[in-house]
Amino acid sequence: MNKRKVGSKNPNISSSPAKRVYSSPQAAMQLSAKVFLGLLKQNQGNLDLENCHYHVTEEVCIENEFSKFSIHLGCGVFEKSLSVEGVSLLRTLSLGSSTIKETLSLKTSHISTLNFGSAKIHGQASLDDITSNGIDFDQAHFNKEGSMKMVYSTGPLNLGEAVFESGLSLEDVGAESINAGSANLGKLTLKELYFGTFYTDSATASKLTIQGNKLSFRGNLLDTSRILTQLDSENLQDSLATRLARAIEAIKDLPSR
């Protein structure tokens, strides 16, 4: 009788990183950028799957080959930087509960739905030349500076419960509505903002600077009829409502020349 040896391996069975990525967090497979992008394409952009844990060891750039994809990053770890650049139409970008240990850069792309989930970004985070139908910072945590420049949403820009440890700057940013939520904005810098309504909600800022004066000012931030505040937040020193009201008043009180 021929006996089969228990535990023997078939040398013809593939053991590629992409196939072994589905495991426990403790055994998360380390992937190169090339293997990660291949895995992303193989799963049609969706890595938010049960028991899908991955660790990318190289810098990753998502480019126009992923146009028309909906990308859900799940709970991956990016040891280096993550960027999205030059994508003509990304239907969805959801960062899930991913961790990015260096920088996050979203540049020159249309992202229909952008959600930061509960992602943790250890390096600087920037959005530059981005159009969208809706942006939600959700519960994301930013250890270093966050910046938005030439960012336009035809829908809401929600700051949610996000935390910006080192501050946030917005320059040439437009949205149907800006909803500050209960975000901790740190040192907040505003320049050239366009919006239908600005809801300050219960958000806080350790400092707020509005760049520009009455002669050079662009945007509608000085139109206080568009800014809605909560009555119980107006008297709190660090509340966004208080900081914003004082900064706007200071600009209006400046001489015209």
Where are these regions (language model features)?
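N-terminal leader/targeting and pre-domain segments
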Residues: 2, 7-257
